Amino acid sequence: MDMRIYKNIPKRILSLCLVFAIGISMGVLSDHFVSENSRFQTFTEKLFRSEVCSNTLTLHYTLAHPEKKGIRKPEATLGTALSDPAKTTSLCQEYEKELKSFAYSRLSEENRLTCDMLLLYFHTRASLGKNSALDEPLGPGLGVQAQLPILLAEYTFRTKEDISDYLKLLSTVRPYFQSIIKLEKQKSQSGLFMSDTTLNRILKQCHSFVANPDSNYMDDIFAQKLKAFSNPAFSSEDQKKLCTYHHKLILTEVIPAYQELADSLESLRGTGKSSRGLAFFEGGREYYLYLLQSQTGTYVPVGQIEKRLSAQLLSDYREISSLLEQNSSLIDRLNQCSGELTLTPTQMLEKLPELMKKDFPELNDATYELRTVHPSMKKFLSPAFYLTPPVDTRSPNVIYINDSGRTSSLELFGTLAHEGFPGHLYQTVSFAENNPSDIRYLVTSSGYVEGWATYVESYGYEYAASLMKNPDSAQNAVRLAWLNRSMNLCIYSLIDIGIHYRGWDAARTAVFLKAFGINNASTAAEIYQYIVETPGNYLKYYWGYLNFLDLKTVCQKRLGDDFDLKEFHRRILDIGPVQFPVLEKYMKQWN
Protein backbone atom coordinates (compact mmCIF):
# COMPACT_ATOMS: atom_id res chain seq x y z
CA MET A 1 0.00 0.00 0.00
CA ASP A 2 1.21 3.50 -0.84
CA MET A 3 1.53 5.23 2.53
CA ARG A 4 1.80 8.68 0.98
CA ILE A 5 -1.97 9.13 0.97
CA TYR A 6 -1.89 9.47 4.76
CA LYS A 7 0.60 12.32 4.92
CA ASN A 8 -1.99 15.06 5.36
CA ILE A 9 -4.26 13.19 7.85
CA PRO A 10 -3.93 14.62 11.39
CA LYS A 11 -2.15 12.21 13.77
CA ARG A 12 -5.06 12.18 16.25
CA ILE A 13 -7.54 11.08 13.56
CA LEU A 14 -5.07 8.45 12.31
CA SER A 15 -4.67 7.03 15.81
CA LEU A 16 -8.46 6.87 16.21
CA CYS A 17 -8.72 5.03 12.90
CA LEU A 18 -6.13 2.50 14.05
CA VAL A 19 -7.89 1.98 17.38
CA PHE A 20 -11.21 1.57 15.58
CA ALA A 21 -9.70 -0.96 13.16
CA ILE A 22 -8.09 -2.92 15.99
CA GLY A 23 -11.39 -2.85 17.89
CA ILE A 24 -13.28 -4.25 14.92
CA SER A 25 -10.72 -7.01 14.33
CA MET A 26 -10.63 -7.92 18.02
CA GLY A 27 -14.41 -8.06 18.05
CA VAL A 28 -14.46 -10.35 15.03
CA LEU A 29 -11.79 -12.57 16.54
CA SER A 30 -13.56 -12.61 19.88
CA ASP A 31 -16.82 -13.65 18.22
CA HIS A 32 -14.93 -16.35 16.36
CA PHE A 33 -13.44 -17.70 19.59
CA VAL A 34 -16.79 -17.55 21.37
CA SER A 35 -18.49 -19.22 18.42
CA GLU A 36 -16.01 -22.10 18.31
CA ASN A 37 -16.11 -22.65 22.07
CA SER A 38 -19.89 -22.48 22.05
CA ARG A 39 -20.03 -25.04 19.23
CA PHE A 40 -17.67 -27.34 21.11
CA GLN A 41 -19.63 -27.07 24.34
CA THR A 42 -22.85 -27.85 22.47
CA PHE A 43 -21.18 -31.00 21.15
CA THR A 44 -20.01 -32.15 24.60
CA GLU A 45 -23.41 -31.43 26.15
CA LYS A 46 -25.11 -33.49 23.44
CA LEU A 47 -22.58 -36.28 23.98
CA PHE A 48 -23.18 -36.21 27.74
CA ARG A 49 -26.96 -36.42 27.36
CA SER A 50 -26.60 -39.36 25.00
CA GLU A 51 -24.19 -41.31 27.23
CA VAL A 52 -25.82 -40.58 30.59
CA CYS A 53 -29.17 -41.98 29.46
CA SER A 54 -27.71 -45.35 28.43
CA ASN A 55 -29.29 -46.97 31.51
CA THR A 56 -31.12 -45.92 34.66
CA LEU A 57 -28.27 -46.70 37.06
CA THR A 58 -25.84 -44.47 35.13
CA LEU A 59 -28.37 -41.64 34.98
CA HIS A 60 -29.37 -41.90 38.65
CA TYR A 61 -25.82 -42.08 40.00
CA THR A 62 -24.68 -39.20 37.74
CA LEU A 63 -27.56 -36.71 38.01
CA ALA A 64 -29.86 -36.07 40.95
CA HIS A 65 -32.09 -33.75 38.90
CA PRO A 66 -31.82 -34.62 35.19
CA GLU A 67 -34.89 -32.50 34.40
CA LYS A 68 -32.89 -29.35 35.22
CA LYS A 69 -30.59 -30.20 32.33
CA GLY A 70 -33.49 -30.81 29.99
CA ILE A 71 -33.15 -34.59 30.25
CA ARG A 72 -36.33 -36.62 30.42
CA LYS A 73 -36.00 -39.84 32.36
CA PRO A 74 -36.42 -42.83 30.06
CA GLU A 75 -38.26 -45.95 31.20
CA ALA A 76 -36.32 -47.65 34.00
CA THR A 77 -33.90 -50.19 32.54
CA LEU A 78 -30.55 -51.83 33.18
CA GLY A 79 -29.83 -51.81 29.46
CA THR A 80 -28.27 -54.78 27.71
CA ALA A 81 -24.94 -56.60 27.77
CA LEU A 82 -25.11 -57.13 24.02
CA SER A 83 -23.46 -54.70 21.64
CA ASP A 84 -22.69 -54.30 17.94
CA PRO A 85 -18.88 -53.94 17.64
CA ALA A 86 -19.06 -52.57 14.09
CA LYS A 87 -21.66 -49.99 15.10
CA THR A 88 -19.64 -48.97 18.17
CA THR A 89 -16.47 -48.57 16.10
CA SER A 90 -18.32 -46.52 13.49
CA LEU A 91 -19.86 -44.25 16.13
CA CYS A 92 -16.49 -43.68 17.82
CA GLN A 93 -14.93 -42.81 14.47
CA GLU A 94 -17.76 -40.35 13.79
CA TYR A 95 -17.15 -38.68 17.16
CA GLU A 96 -13.42 -38.56 16.45
CA LYS A 97 -14.05 -36.96 13.06
CA GLU A 98 -16.36 -34.36 14.60
CA LEU A 99 -13.82 -33.52 17.30
CA LYS A 100 -11.16 -32.96 14.65
CA SER A 101 -13.47 -30.54 12.83
CA PHE A 102 -13.13 -27.94 15.59
CA ALA A 103 -10.58 -25.18 15.16
CA TYR A 104 -8.34 -26.37 17.99
CA SER A 105 -6.36 -23.11 18.31
CA ARG A 106 -9.59 -21.16 18.84
CA LEU A 107 -10.73 -23.27 21.77
CA SER A 108 -10.16 -22.21 25.36
CA GLU A 109 -7.52 -24.13 27.30
CA GLU A 110 -10.22 -26.02 29.20
CA ASN A 111 -11.93 -27.04 25.96
CA ARG A 112 -8.62 -28.01 24.34
CA LEU A 113 -7.96 -30.28 27.30
CA THR A 114 -11.41 -31.86 26.98
CA CYS A 115 -10.90 -32.23 23.23
CA ASP A 116 -7.53 -33.96 23.71
CA MET A 117 -9.01 -36.34 26.24
CA LEU A 118 -12.05 -37.18 24.10
CA LEU A 119 -9.99 -37.66 20.93
CA LEU A 120 -7.76 -40.18 22.67
CA TYR A 121 -10.76 -41.86 24.30
CA PHE A 122 -12.72 -42.39 21.08
CA HIS A 123 -9.63 -43.34 19.08
CA THR A 124 -8.88 -46.02 21.68
CA ARG A 125 -12.49 -47.25 21.79
CA ALA A 126 -12.55 -47.53 18.00
CA SER A 127 -9.42 -49.70 18.08
CA LEU A 128 -11.17 -52.49 20.00
CA GLY A 129 -13.10 -53.84 17.01
CA LYS A 130 -13.75 -57.59 16.97
CA ASN A 131 -11.66 -58.08 20.12
CA SER A 132 -14.72 -56.88 22.06
CA ALA A 133 -15.67 -60.58 22.10
CA LEU A 134 -13.08 -60.92 24.89
CA ASP A 135 -15.02 -58.53 27.14
CA GLU A 136 -16.30 -60.40 30.21
CA PRO A 137 -19.17 -58.85 32.20
CA LEU A 138 -19.11 -61.61 34.84
CA GLY A 139 -16.45 -62.30 37.44
CA PRO A 140 -16.12 -63.40 41.08
CA GLY A 141 -14.63 -60.09 42.23
CA LEU A 142 -15.63 -57.28 39.89
CA GLY A 143 -18.34 -58.93 37.81
CA VAL A 144 -21.78 -57.46 37.27
CA GLN A 145 -23.48 -60.28 39.19
CA ALA A 146 -21.41 -59.29 42.25
CA GLN A 147 -21.73 -55.51 41.86
CA LEU A 148 -25.41 -55.21 40.87
CA PRO A 149 -26.94 -55.95 44.31
CA ILE A 150 -24.64 -53.33 45.84
CA LEU A 151 -25.56 -50.71 43.21
CA LEU A 152 -29.24 -51.44 43.76
CA ALA A 153 -28.91 -51.40 47.54
CA GLU A 154 -27.16 -48.00 47.41
CA TYR A 155 -29.71 -46.53 44.97
CA THR A 156 -30.54 -43.19 46.61
CA PHE A 157 -34.18 -42.32 47.29
CA ARG A 158 -34.49 -38.56 46.77
CA THR A 159 -38.10 -38.54 45.55
CA LYS A 160 -41.00 -40.97 45.37
CA GLU A 161 -40.26 -41.29 41.65
CA ASP A 162 -36.83 -42.68 42.58
CA ILE A 163 -38.50 -45.38 44.65
CA SER A 164 -40.81 -46.20 41.75
CA ASP A 165 -37.85 -46.39 39.34
CA TYR A 166 -35.94 -48.62 41.73
CA LEU A 167 -38.84 -51.06 42.00
CA LYS A 168 -39.15 -51.12 38.20
CA LEU A 169 -35.42 -51.83 37.94
CA LEU A 170 -35.88 -54.99 39.98
CA SER A 171 -38.19 -56.23 37.23
CA THR A 172 -35.50 -55.61 34.60
CA VAL A 173 -32.80 -57.74 36.24
CA ARG A 174 -34.05 -60.87 34.47
CA PRO A 175 -34.02 -59.46 30.89
CA TYR A 176 -30.63 -57.91 31.59
CA PHE A 177 -29.24 -61.23 32.80
CA GLN A 178 -30.80 -62.93 29.79
CA SER A 179 -28.74 -60.64 27.55
CA ILE A 180 -25.65 -61.75 29.51
CA ILE A 181 -26.66 -65.41 29.05
CA LYS A 182 -26.95 -64.85 25.30
CA LEU A 183 -23.52 -63.21 25.30
CA GLU A 184 -21.97 -66.08 27.26
CA LYS A 185 -23.46 -68.62 24.83
CA GLN A 186 -21.85 -66.70 21.96
CA LYS A 187 -18.54 -66.76 23.82
CA SER A 188 -18.92 -70.49 24.40
CA GLN A 189 -19.50 -71.14 20.69
CA SER A 190 -16.39 -69.09 19.87
CA GLY A 191 -14.21 -70.92 22.40
CA LEU A 192 -14.02 -67.85 24.64
CA PHE A 193 -16.08 -69.05 27.61
CA MET A 194 -14.64 -68.86 31.13
CA SER A 195 -12.79 -71.72 32.79
CA ASP A 196 -14.60 -74.11 35.10
CA THR A 197 -12.61 -72.66 38.02
CA THR A 198 -13.96 -69.17 37.36
CA LEU A 199 -17.41 -70.61 36.71
CA ASN A 200 -17.41 -72.33 40.12
CA ARG A 201 -16.52 -69.05 41.86
CA ILE A 202 -19.31 -67.16 40.10
CA LEU A 203 -21.85 -69.92 40.76
CA LYS A 204 -20.92 -69.90 44.43
CA GLN A 205 -21.85 -66.20 44.59
CA CYS A 206 -25.12 -66.74 42.74
CA HIS A 207 -26.09 -69.66 44.98
CA SER A 208 -25.21 -67.63 48.07
CA PHE A 209 -27.46 -64.80 46.90
CA VAL A 210 -30.49 -67.07 46.35
CA ALA A 211 -29.88 -69.37 49.34
CA ASN A 212 -32.22 -67.61 51.79
CA PRO A 213 -34.91 -65.90 49.70
CA ASP A 214 -37.00 -64.94 52.73
CA SER A 215 -34.11 -63.11 54.41
CA ASN A 216 -32.38 -61.35 51.53
CA TYR A 217 -30.31 -58.39 52.68
CA MET A 218 -31.83 -56.16 49.97
CA ASP A 219 -35.16 -56.34 51.86
CA ASP A 220 -33.50 -55.10 55.06
CA ILE A 221 -31.79 -52.21 53.31
CA PHE A 222 -34.96 -51.20 51.45
CA ALA A 223 -36.92 -51.08 54.71
CA GLN A 224 -34.17 -49.02 56.32
CA LYS A 225 -34.17 -46.51 53.44
CA LEU A 226 -37.96 -46.21 53.45
CA LYS A 227 -37.93 -45.45 57.16
CA ALA A 228 -35.39 -42.67 56.60
CA PHE A 229 -37.23 -41.21 53.58
CA SER A 230 -38.80 -37.81 54.29
CA ASN A 231 -39.87 -36.28 50.96
CA PRO A 232 -42.57 -36.67 52.28
CA ALA A 233 -42.35 -39.44 54.86
CA PHE A 234 -44.36 -42.62 54.42
CA SER A 235 -46.84 -43.77 57.02
CA SER A 236 -46.10 -47.04 58.79
CA GLU A 237 -48.87 -48.69 56.78
CA ASP A 238 -47.46 -47.46 53.45
CA GLN A 239 -43.98 -48.60 54.44
CA LYS A 240 -45.35 -52.04 55.21
CA LYS A 241 -47.13 -52.26 51.83
CA LEU A 242 -44.03 -51.17 49.92
CA CYS A 243 -41.83 -53.61 51.82
CA THR A 244 -44.26 -56.43 51.02
CA TYR A 245 -44.20 -55.48 47.34
CA HIS A 246 -40.40 -55.23 47.39
CA HIS A 247 -40.11 -58.69 48.93
CA LYS A 248 -42.44 -60.04 46.24
CA LEU A 249 -40.18 -58.57 43.51
CA ILE A 250 -37.11 -60.12 45.14
CA LEU A 251 -38.86 -63.52 45.20
CA THR A 252 -40.42 -63.38 41.73
CA GLU A 253 -37.92 -61.31 39.73
CA VAL A 254 -34.45 -60.93 41.23
CA ILE A 255 -33.85 -64.36 42.74
CA PRO A 256 -35.24 -66.21 39.68
CA ALA A 257 -32.97 -64.04 37.51
CA TYR A 258 -29.92 -65.14 39.51
CA GLN A 259 -31.09 -68.76 39.44
CA GLU A 260 -31.60 -68.63 35.67
CA LEU A 261 -28.15 -67.09 35.24
CA ALA A 262 -26.58 -69.82 37.38
CA ASP A 263 -28.42 -72.63 35.57
CA SER A 264 -27.52 -71.26 32.13
CA LEU A 265 -23.86 -70.86 33.05
CA GLU A 266 -23.81 -74.39 34.47
CA SER A 267 -25.07 -75.70 31.14
CA LEU A 268 -21.96 -74.22 29.49
CA ARG A 269 -19.55 -75.95 31.88
CA GLY A 270 -16.59 -77.53 30.14
CA THR A 271 -16.84 -75.38 27.01
CA GLY A 272 -14.17 -72.96 28.20
CA LYS A 273 -10.42 -73.39 28.40
CA SER A 274 -8.49 -74.02 31.60
CA SER A 275 -7.65 -70.93 33.63
CA ARG A 276 -5.38 -68.94 31.37
CA GLY A 277 -4.63 -65.34 30.64
CA LEU A 278 -5.61 -63.31 27.60
CA ALA A 279 -2.35 -64.22 25.83
CA PHE A 280 -3.76 -67.68 25.07
CA PHE A 281 -6.69 -66.31 23.06
CA GLU A 282 -6.69 -65.02 19.51
CA GLY A 283 -6.36 -61.25 19.69
CA GLY A 284 -5.75 -61.54 23.45
CA ARG A 285 -2.53 -59.54 23.56
CA GLU A 286 -4.10 -56.77 21.47
CA TYR A 287 -7.11 -56.76 23.80
CA TYR A 288 -4.80 -56.52 26.82
CA LEU A 289 -3.08 -53.49 25.29
CA TYR A 290 -6.53 -52.00 24.77
CA LEU A 291 -7.30 -52.53 28.49
CA LEU A 292 -4.05 -50.80 29.48
CA GLN A 293 -4.97 -47.84 27.30
CA SER A 294 -8.69 -47.61 28.10
CA GLN A 295 -8.57 -48.47 31.81
CA THR A 296 -5.09 -47.49 32.96
CA GLY A 297 -4.70 -44.57 30.56
CA THR A 298 -1.18 -45.54 29.51
CA TYR A 299 0.17 -45.83 25.97
CA VAL A 300 3.66 -46.95 26.94
CA PRO A 301 5.01 -50.21 25.39
CA VAL A 302 4.63 -53.23 27.68
CA GLY A 303 8.38 -53.83 27.78
CA GLN A 304 8.89 -50.30 29.09
CA ILE A 305 6.23 -50.84 31.76
CA GLU A 306 7.95 -54.06 32.88
CA LYS A 307 11.31 -52.29 33.03
CA ARG A 308 9.90 -49.48 35.19
CA LEU A 309 8.09 -51.91 37.49
CA SER A 310 11.26 -53.97 37.96
CA ALA A 311 13.26 -50.84 38.76
CA GLN A 312 10.73 -49.80 41.42
CA LEU A 313 10.71 -53.28 42.89
CA LEU A 314 14.48 -53.21 43.23
CA SER A 315 14.41 -49.68 44.67
CA ASP A 316 11.82 -50.61 47.30
CA TYR A 317 13.71 -53.79 48.20
CA ARG A 318 16.96 -51.87 48.68
CA GLU A 319 15.25 -49.27 50.85
CA ILE A 320 13.69 -51.99 53.02
CA SER A 321 17.08 -53.68 53.38
CA SER A 322 18.70 -50.39 54.32
CA LEU A 323 16.04 -49.62 56.95
CA LEU A 324 16.41 -53.07 58.54
CA GLU A 325 20.22 -52.83 58.51
CA GLN A 326 19.98 -49.55 60.41
CA ASN A 327 17.46 -50.94 62.89
CA SER A 328 16.95 -54.70 63.14
CA SER A 329 14.03 -54.25 65.57
CA LEU A 330 12.03 -52.18 63.07
CA ILE A 331 9.56 -54.99 62.39
CA ASP A 332 8.80 -55.23 66.12
CA ARG A 333 8.29 -51.46 66.16
CA LEU A 334 5.90 -51.79 63.21
CA ASN A 335 3.82 -54.34 65.12
CA GLN A 336 3.55 -51.84 67.98
CA CYS A 337 2.41 -49.03 65.69
CA SER A 338 -1.09 -50.33 65.06
CA GLY A 339 -1.62 -50.64 68.79
CA GLU A 340 -0.66 -46.98 69.22
CA LEU A 341 -3.10 -45.81 66.55
CA THR A 342 -6.28 -46.01 68.62
CA LEU A 343 -8.43 -43.53 66.69
CA THR A 344 -11.88 -44.44 65.45
CA PRO A 345 -12.58 -44.16 61.70
CA THR A 346 -14.44 -40.90 62.37
CA GLN A 347 -11.44 -39.46 64.22
CA MET A 348 -9.06 -40.61 61.48
CA LEU A 349 -11.07 -38.76 58.83
CA GLU A 350 -11.18 -35.67 61.03
CA LYS A 351 -7.39 -35.72 61.45
CA LEU A 352 -6.43 -36.27 57.81
CA PRO A 353 -7.46 -32.84 56.36
CA GLU A 354 -5.34 -31.07 58.97
CA LEU A 355 -2.33 -33.36 58.54
CA MET A 356 -2.30 -33.01 54.74
CA LYS A 357 -2.34 -29.18 54.67
CA LYS A 358 1.42 -28.93 54.25
CA ASP A 359 1.37 -31.04 51.08
CA PHE A 360 -2.02 -30.47 49.45
CA PRO A 361 -4.20 -27.42 48.69
CA GLU A 362 -7.09 -26.77 51.05
CA LEU A 363 -10.63 -27.23 49.79
CA ASN A 364 -13.30 -24.55 50.06
CA ASP A 365 -15.86 -27.08 51.16
CA ALA A 366 -15.46 -30.77 51.84
CA THR A 367 -18.46 -31.95 53.81
CA TYR A 368 -18.99 -35.67 53.99
CA GLU A 369 -20.98 -38.37 55.71
CA LEU A 370 -19.54 -41.45 57.35
CA ARG A 371 -21.78 -44.48 57.21
CA THR A 372 -21.41 -48.05 58.37
CA VAL A 373 -21.91 -50.89 55.93
CA HIS A 374 -25.10 -52.86 56.56
CA PRO A 375 -24.21 -56.04 58.54
CA SER A 376 -25.52 -58.28 55.77
CA MET A 377 -23.12 -56.74 53.24
CA LYS A 378 -19.91 -56.82 55.28
CA LYS A 379 -18.52 -59.99 53.74
CA PHE A 380 -19.00 -58.64 50.21
CA LEU A 381 -17.31 -55.25 50.60
CA SER A 382 -13.87 -53.78 51.19
CA PRO A 383 -12.85 -52.20 54.55
CA ALA A 384 -13.94 -48.77 53.28
CA PHE A 385 -15.20 -47.22 50.05
CA TYR A 386 -16.24 -43.83 48.73
CA LEU A 387 -19.52 -43.28 46.92
CA THR A 388 -19.22 -40.52 44.30
CA PRO A 389 -22.05 -37.94 44.50
CA PRO A 390 -24.15 -36.79 41.52
CA VAL A 391 -22.43 -34.09 39.47
CA ASP A 392 -25.31 -31.62 39.78
CA THR A 393 -25.50 -31.68 43.59
CA ARG A 394 -21.89 -32.61 44.47
CA SER A 395 -23.26 -34.11 47.65
CA PRO A 396 -23.52 -36.17 49.68
CA ASN A 397 -19.92 -37.34 49.75
CA VAL A 398 -20.29 -40.66 51.53
CA ILE A 399 -17.57 -42.91 52.89
CA TYR A 400 -18.69 -46.34 54.02
CA ILE A 401 -16.82 -48.14 56.78
CA ASN A 402 -16.87 -51.91 56.92
CA ASP A 403 -16.01 -52.68 60.54
CA SER A 404 -15.59 -56.39 59.96
CA GLY A 405 -12.21 -56.29 61.71
CA ARG A 406 -10.22 -57.58 58.75
CA THR A 407 -7.56 -54.84 58.81
CA SER A 408 -5.17 -53.31 61.32
CA SER A 409 -5.65 -49.71 62.41
CA LEU A 410 -2.62 -48.63 60.34
CA GLU A 411 -4.02 -50.32 57.23
CA LEU A 412 -7.40 -48.71 57.88
CA PHE A 413 -5.76 -45.29 58.18
CA GLY A 414 -4.09 -45.84 54.81
CA THR A 415 -7.38 -47.02 53.33
CA LEU A 416 -9.18 -43.90 54.60
CA ALA A 417 -6.44 -41.74 53.08
CA HIS A 418 -7.03 -43.63 49.81
CA GLU A 419 -10.83 -43.27 49.92
CA GLY A 420 -11.12 -39.92 51.70
CA PHE A 421 -8.36 -37.34 52.23
CA PRO A 422 -6.30 -36.76 50.14
CA GLY A 423 -7.72 -39.62 48.04
CA HIS A 424 -10.94 -40.15 46.11
CA LEU A 425 -13.23 -37.81 48.07
CA TYR A 426 -10.69 -34.98 48.12
CA GLN A 427 -9.82 -35.41 44.42
CA THR A 428 -13.50 -35.50 43.40
CA VAL A 429 -14.43 -32.38 45.38
CA SER A 430 -11.30 -30.53 44.25
CA PHE A 431 -12.03 -31.26 40.59
CA ALA A 432 -15.67 -30.19 40.97
CA GLU A 433 -14.58 -26.79 42.33
CA ASN A 434 -13.34 -25.94 38.82
CA ASN A 435 -16.83 -26.48 37.35
CA PRO A 436 -15.72 -28.80 34.54
CA SER A 437 -18.05 -29.73 31.70
CA ASP A 438 -20.38 -32.61 32.52
CA ILE A 439 -18.76 -34.97 30.00
CA ARG A 440 -15.59 -34.94 32.12
CA TYR A 441 -17.46 -36.89 34.79
CA LEU A 442 -18.53 -39.64 32.39
CA VAL A 443 -15.41 -39.95 30.26
CA THR A 444 -12.66 -40.34 32.80
CA SER A 445 -9.50 -42.36 33.47
CA SER A 446 -9.38 -45.12 36.08
CA GLY A 447 -5.58 -45.03 35.96
CA TYR A 448 -5.61 -41.38 37.07
CA VAL A 449 -8.33 -41.91 39.70
CA GLU A 450 -6.93 -45.07 41.28
CA GLY A 451 -3.33 -44.06 40.65
CA TRP A 452 -3.89 -40.79 42.52
CA ALA A 453 -5.55 -42.57 45.45
CA THR A 454 -2.64 -45.04 45.66
CA TYR A 455 -0.08 -42.24 45.33
CA VAL A 456 -1.59 -40.27 48.23
CA GLU A 457 -1.99 -43.43 50.30
CA SER A 458 1.77 -43.31 50.81
CA TYR A 459 1.32 -39.86 52.39
CA GLY A 460 -1.40 -41.34 54.59
CA TYR A 461 1.08 -43.80 56.08
CA GLU A 462 3.46 -40.92 56.76
CA TYR A 463 0.71 -38.92 58.47
CA ALA A 464 -0.21 -41.93 60.62
CA ALA A 465 3.28 -41.94 62.14
CA SER A 466 2.77 -38.39 63.44
CA LEU A 467 -0.16 -39.61 65.56
CA MET A 468 1.82 -42.27 67.42
CA LYS A 469 3.52 -42.09 70.82
CA ASN A 470 7.00 -41.70 69.38
CA PRO A 471 6.59 -40.23 65.87
CA ASP A 472 10.32 -40.28 65.11
CA SER A 473 10.76 -44.00 65.73
CA ALA A 474 7.40 -44.73 64.13
CA GLN A 475 8.31 -42.93 60.90
CA ASN A 476 10.70 -45.60 59.62
CA ALA A 477 8.46 -48.42 60.80
CA VAL A 478 5.49 -46.97 58.95
CA ARG A 479 7.68 -46.36 55.91
CA LEU A 480 8.51 -50.07 56.03
CA ALA A 481 4.78 -50.87 55.95
CA TRP A 482 4.24 -48.70 52.88
CA LEU A 483 7.25 -50.16 51.06
CA ASN A 484 5.91 -53.64 51.74
CA ARG A 485 2.54 -52.65 50.27
CA SER A 486 4.25 -51.04 47.28
CA MET A 487 6.27 -54.19 46.61
CA ASN A 488 3.18 -56.39 46.79
CA LEU A 489 1.31 -54.21 44.30
CA CYS A 490 4.37 -54.16 42.05
CA ILE A 491 4.72 -57.96 42.14
CA TYR A 492 1.03 -58.39 41.28
CA SER A 493 1.37 -55.89 38.43
CA LEU A 494 4.30 -57.81 36.97
CA ILE A 495 2.31 -61.04 37.27
CA ASP A 496 -0.62 -59.33 35.52
CA ILE A 497 1.59 -58.62 32.51
CA GLY A 498 3.17 -62.06 32.77
CA ILE A 499 -0.17 -63.87 32.67
CA HIS A 500 -2.03 -61.74 30.14
CA TYR A 501 0.76 -60.62 27.80
CA ARG A 502 3.65 -63.07 28.23
CA GLY A 503 1.48 -66.17 28.61
CA TRP A 504 2.48 -67.35 32.09
CA ASP A 505 0.58 -70.35 33.42
CA ALA A 506 -0.06 -71.20 37.08
CA ALA A 507 3.28 -73.04 37.44
CA ARG A 508 5.31 -70.14 36.01
CA THR A 509 3.47 -67.72 38.29
CA ALA A 510 4.19 -69.90 41.35
CA VAL A 511 7.92 -69.93 40.50
CA PHE A 512 7.90 -66.12 40.27
CA LEU A 513 6.14 -65.80 43.64
CA LYS A 514 8.60 -68.20 45.30
CA ALA A 515 11.39 -65.77 44.45
CA PHE A 516 9.68 -63.33 46.84
CA GLY A 517 9.10 -65.81 49.63
CA ILE A 518 5.52 -66.77 48.75
CA ASN A 519 5.81 -70.55 48.94
CA ASN A 520 2.28 -71.53 49.93
CA ALA A 521 0.72 -73.32 46.95
CA SER A 522 -2.87 -72.32 47.74
CA THR A 523 -1.87 -68.66 48.16
CA ALA A 524 -0.06 -68.71 44.81
CA ALA A 525 -3.05 -70.39 43.17
CA GLU A 526 -5.44 -67.79 44.57
CA ILE A 527 -3.25 -64.90 43.36
CA TYR A 528 -3.00 -66.48 39.91
CA GLN A 529 -6.74 -67.08 39.65
CA TYR A 530 -7.69 -63.57 40.78
CA ILE A 531 -5.37 -61.94 38.24
CA VAL A 532 -6.60 -64.26 35.47
CA GLU A 533 -10.13 -63.00 36.21
CA THR A 534 -9.26 -59.28 36.46
CA PRO A 535 -6.81 -58.39 33.65
CA GLY A 536 -5.18 -54.99 34.08
CA ASN A 537 -6.83 -54.27 37.43
CA TYR A 538 -3.66 -54.01 39.54
CA LEU A 539 -2.03 -51.78 36.94
CA LYS A 540 -4.78 -49.17 37.29
CA TYR A 541 -3.61 -48.70 40.86
CA TYR A 542 0.10 -49.30 40.70
CA TRP A 543 1.10 -48.13 37.23
CA GLY A 544 -1.11 -45.11 37.88
CA TYR A 545 0.78 -44.52 41.13
CA LEU A 546 4.15 -44.75 39.38
CA ASN A 547 3.03 -42.25 36.74
CA PHE A 548 2.37 -39.65 39.44
CA LEU A 549 5.63 -40.51 41.16
CA ASP A 550 7.59 -40.13 37.91
CA LEU A 551 5.75 -36.95 36.93
CA LYS A 552 6.78 -35.43 40.26
CA THR A 553 10.42 -36.37 39.60
CA VAL A 554 10.29 -34.81 36.11
CA CYS A 555 8.82 -31.56 37.45
CA GLN A 556 11.35 -31.43 40.29
CA LYS A 557 14.24 -31.77 37.83
CA ARG A 558 12.81 -29.19 35.43
CA LEU A 559 11.91 -26.58 38.06
CA GLY A 560 14.73 -27.15 40.53
CA ASP A 561 14.41 -24.86 43.55
CA ASP A 562 11.19 -23.41 42.11
CA PHE A 563 9.39 -26.73 42.53
CA ASP A 564 6.57 -26.55 45.06
CA LEU A 565 4.88 -29.79 46.12
CA LYS A 566 1.54 -28.22 46.98
CA GLU A 567 1.45 -26.41 43.63
CA PHE A 568 2.34 -29.66 41.85
CA HIS A 569 -0.64 -31.35 43.46
CA ARG A 570 -2.92 -28.39 42.72
CA ARG A 571 -2.11 -28.50 39.02
CA ILE A 572 -2.74 -32.24 38.79
CA LEU A 573 -6.07 -31.82 40.58
CA ASP A 574 -7.09 -28.90 38.35
CA ILE A 575 -6.41 -30.90 35.19
CA GLY A 576 -8.49 -33.75 36.58
CA PRO A 577 -8.92 -37.37 35.49
CA VAL A 578 -7.42 -37.79 32.01
CA GLN A 579 -5.18 -40.31 30.28
CA PHE A 580 -1.52 -39.95 31.23
CA PRO A 581 -0.28 -38.60 27.85
CA VAL A 582 -2.82 -35.76 28.21
CA LEU A 583 -1.84 -35.13 31.83
CA GLU A 584 1.84 -34.99 30.91
CA LYS A 585 1.17 -32.58 28.03
CA TYR A 586 -0.54 -30.03 30.28
CA MET A 587 1.88 -30.47 33.19
CA LYS A 588 4.73 -29.52 30.81
CA GLN A 589 3.17 -26.06 30.63
CA TRP A 590 4.10 -25.50 34.28
CA ASN A 591 7.16 -23.24 34.19
Where do the protein language model's features map onto the residues?
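N-terminal maturation segment of proteins
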Residues: Y6-N591
